[in-house]
């Protein structure tokens, strides 16, 4: 790609139609994506003598090529722009760091509907309630619903293969529709309807119906049933008393913004059916010299318009900032949703109070983030001084976790100049080594991580190896043998070993596998950042190992039983609804599983009991 960009010749070929443009540097990397109602007019503005900002000057100085894509409408250009931003992640665009789809509560369309958490495309038949700000909020709500309305939450594979009710039925958190005769179709359908009304924000209707049923049961002298319904009423009231509810019953997203010291926080409040489902703070990646208007406009566009987000659009969006393209945004969102979406920047009444709440939350979150960054910057600066490096802009740390050599998992965590970069944390399943050989595990993960091409901006300044001299020797050996296109001599390899008592503050650091290490004072900021990244790596490895161990735990106790191979194990677990159900089953119930004889059922029963 040419290093010299002929702007005059390029502009002669550009159309005045709407479209999207992509700017490339000399290395062929997309550095900026933009849209325009008039491509020629917009692109010409980059090559004037008096540019608007230093950011634009720096961008233009790097341009080696510009590609344009003409679109039929400005709305189409807006949608394409944000899809390109998501695809290329250009360094001069404002970037939304968190692009995970939001979770919903899913009420299936089965004969006996189930409740579950759902992310992604909504292909399954049923109803979706949300979005919720995170998975924790969904799980908390599902646990609450299970206590109040005992609708099943088990997978269909478990539900269809049960011959006896599970533990959830025994503790009163499921009506047991899997077993005939435990609950009538009418009663189960009634509880499902309560769930539907409750999630739709119609608490008053739920209470009205429950009170009527309680009074009817009482008049019929069915006092146990009346007492059970009374408990449901009290539970619903306790929940609704805690909720911040709007009288309007509207669906709103409320977006507050705070901007300070080159950092932005966008706080989104999710309101559905008049209830605040939750909120979340975002810290978009903001290139230096970017104005607040561009931050807000780009964030809102990426938040709602990027194709894979699977975001459910509310009827109205309240914004804490006046947008130049408010009409275009509203039209694009309406086209995407297939219904009218209103974008409001100057609300009154309750809506103004919502916006004030979002603004306050954004400011509070930004203040906290800036304080945390100040601390991490000081610690990284102190570490750079100790290690005699100009700066530490990126660190990576590795740890190994296993139980007696089984289910070995290696973790890699990444810190940049702002601290933990969790989107880049990775786990590696280690295979093909002698069980318990941590050195071989470290050797394998380092080769997998670094034995390939790496972007220049992702080459770490420091690689921290948890485990001391032996593990550091493995790292040195791996790097000596690497044949890669990037500078393998750039990262500083640093080993860290805990003291004999494994207490924080007694760590020994090693530059080389031979000789003596050195220790830092317990109050050293450099030591604190080392402890931080090492603990993150340790936790990440352990959580990955536990997940892997839990995955095989359900089958491990069956693997030792003669005559029970993989297919029979799968059939047993599927038919009995998991290992817990199998452990509770009688010989007769086990013998009903297809492919299991009475003799084998006895063997399975006694093996699990003893």
Swiss-Prot record:
Q: Which family is annotated?
A: Belongs to the UvrC family.
Keyword line: Cytoplasm, DNA damage, DNA excision, DNA repair, Excision nuclease, SOS response
What name does this protein carry?
UvrABC system protein C
Instruction: State the residue spans of region: Disordered.
Output: 540-559
Cellular location(s): Cytoplasm
Question: Per the UniProt entry, what species is this protein from, by scientific name?
Answer: Klebsiella pneumoniae (strain 342)
The entry describes its oligomerization and partners as: Interacts with UvrB in an incision complex.
Q: Name one GO biological process term.
A: nucleotide-excision repair
Q: Which domain of life is it from?
A: Bacteria
Primary residence:
cytoplasm
**SUPFAM superfamilies per the UniProt record, alphabetical:** C-terminal UvrC-binding domain of UvrB, GIY-YIG endonuclease, RuvA domain 2-like
> What residue stretches are annotated with the GIY-YIG domain?
16-94
